[in-house]
Design a protein with these regions (language model features):
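N-terminal glycine-rich phosphate/pyrophosphate-binding loop and immediately adjacent elements
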Residues: 2-153
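Conserved acidic residues
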Residues: 3, 286, 299
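Conserved SAM/SAH-binding loop
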Residues: 11, 272-276, 292-293
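General beta-strand structural signal in soluble alpha/beta enzymes
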Residues: 29-31, 206-208, 271, 298, ...
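Flexible loop/turn segments at secondary-structure boundaries
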Residues: 35-39, 214-217, 277-279, 308-312
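Active-site/ligand-binding neighborhood in enzyme catalytic cores
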Residues: 127-265
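Glycine-rich loop(s) and the adjacent beta-strand/alpha-helix scaffold that form part
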Residues: 244-260, 264-265, 278-279, 289-334
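A conserved short coil-to-beta-strand element within the FAD-binding core of flavoproteins
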Residues: 268-286
Length: 334
C-alpha cells in the first residue's frame, strides 16, 4: 500500500511528491499522458522543432523549491528574458521594455515624459506590496469554507497551524502600512483603472495590461486582473527579483528535472495511466481505480488535476458535503 497516490505529474504534483518522499512516505505519481509536466512541457510540434506548448516562462518558482530539489543538478538552467516585451506602434515608433529601469524610462519618454517619471514609482509600489505578500505564498491557507464536523476532525495541531497562518498574514498586512488601500485594490480589483491613474500613454498601458490578462479570456477591466500585475515583480527564478526567464530546453526541461529529483527521493512515477475514480470507504480514502480496471490501495490522495475534475469527476456525487460540492461547481476558470 502507498502512503499517497498523486494524480497528475504536473510540476505541482512533482513538487508535492518530492516533499512527501523526503518525509519518508511511499509515493506513487500517476500521469494520464506519456510525458510528465502537465502544462509545463516541451513537445515537438513540427519535425525538428520543439517548443513549450503551454507555460513558456519561469519566475514564480520558489528558490526554496529549487534548492531543496537540487534542480540545477538535474539539468535545470534559466536564461533571463531580455527584453521582456516589444510593442510596435502604428506611427513607426515602438516600446521596448526590459530589466534596466533607465533604459525603460528612455523608451517610455518617447510617448510621455510624465509616464517616464511615474514608471519607477509604479514599480516601487508594486515591489513593496509584493515583498510584503510573498511570504504568504509559503503558508498553508486556513480553511474558510464551513464544513460539517463529521467530515473532518479539527485537532489542536490544525488549529495551531491556522492561527500561525493568520498571524503571518497579519504581519504581512501590517508591513504594508499606507499602501494597504493599493494592496487591496491590486488583490481584488481590475487592472485598467489602476493603469489609467498611473499613466497616460496608451502604448504603455496596453503593454503593462498584458501582464494582467495573460492566459485568460478577461479584459483588463475585469475584477481580479490587477492581481496579476503583481506577478510582474514577484519571483526570482530568473536570477533576480522580478526577472522572468526562459528554461533552457523549454519548460519541459524543468518538469524533467523535477521528475528526476522526485525519483532520486524514492518517488515512483507511471505515465500513460488514467485514474477513473478515487475510492472512498467509511469516509476514508482507500485507493484509486484506473481506466484499466486495476485498483491501487493508498492511505491518501493528492490531486494535481483541477477542482472540477477532482471533486466532480473522480469522486462520486453526494460523497462530499453539499456546501462543498456547490462551492466547487461555482469555480469559474474563464
Amino acid at each position: 500500500m502507498y502512503d499517497c497516490v498523486i494524480i497528475g505529474a504536473g510540476h505541482n504534483g512533482l513538487v508535492c511528491a518530492h516533499q512527501l518522499a523526503k518525509q519518508g512516505w511511499k509515493v506513487l505519481v500517476l500521469e494520464r499522458r506519456d510525458l510528465v509536466g502537465g502544462a509545463c512541457v516541451t513537445e515537438e510540434l513540427w519535425p525538428g522543432f520543439k517548443v513549450s506548448t503551454a507555460s513558456y516562462l519561469v519566475s514564480l518558482l520558489l528558490p526554496e523549491i529549487e534548492e531543496e530539489m537540487q534542480l540545477a543538478r538535474h539539468g535545470y538552467r534559466v536564461l533571463p528574458r531580455n527584453p521582456s516585451s516589444f510593442t510596435p506602434g502604428t506611427d513607426g515608433r515602438s516600446l521596448l521594455l526590459g530589466p534596466d529601469l533607465k533604459q525603460n524610462q528612455q523608451q517610455i519618454s518617447q510617448f510621455s515624459t510624465r509616464d517616464a517619471e511615474q514608471f519607477p514609482r509604479y514599480e516601487a509600489m508594486l515591489q513593496k506590496i509584493a515583498e510584503c505578500l510573498e511570504p504568504a505564498l509559503m503558508q498553508t491557507p486556513p480553511d474558510l469554507l464551513p464544513l460539517p464536523a463529521s467530515w473532518r476532525s479539527v485537532g489542536f495541531r490544525k488549529k495551531f497551524r491556522d492561527t500561525k497562518t493568520a498571524y503571518h498574514l497579519h504581519q504581512s498586512l501590517k508591513h504594508l502600512g499606507e499602501t494597504i488601500p493599493e494592496a487591496i485594490e491590486l488583490l481584488t480589483g481590475p487592472a485598467l483603472p489602476i493603469l489609467n491613474r498611473w499613466f497616460e500613454s496608451d502604448i504603455l498601458k496596453a503593454t503593462l495590461a498584458t501582464d494582467a490578462i495573460i492566459g485568460t479570456f478577461q479584459p483588463p477591466s475585469a475584477p481580479g486582473t490587477a492581481y496579476v500585475l503583481l506577478h510582474h515583480v514577484m519571483g526570482s527564478a530568473g536570477g533576480a527579483r522580478g526577472v522572468w526567464g526562459y528554461v533552457e530546453g523549454g519548460m519541459g526541461a524543468l518538469s524533467q528535472a523535477m521528475a528526476a529529483s522526485a525519483k532520486a527521493a524514492g518517488v515512483e512515477i507511471r505515465t500513460g495511466i488514467s485514474v477513473e475514480e478515487i475510492l472512498i470507504s467509511d469516509q476514508q480514502i482507500s485507493g484509486v481505480r484506473l481506466s484499466t480496471g486495476e485498483t491501487i490501495a493508498t492511505r491518501s490522495v493528492a490531486s494535481n488535476a483541477d477542482a472540477h475534475v477532482t471533486f466532480e469527476k473522480l469522486i462520486p456525487a453526494g460523497t462530499l458535503p453539499e456546501t462543498f460540492e456547490k462551492a466547487v461547481s461555482r469555480i469559474d476558470y474563464s
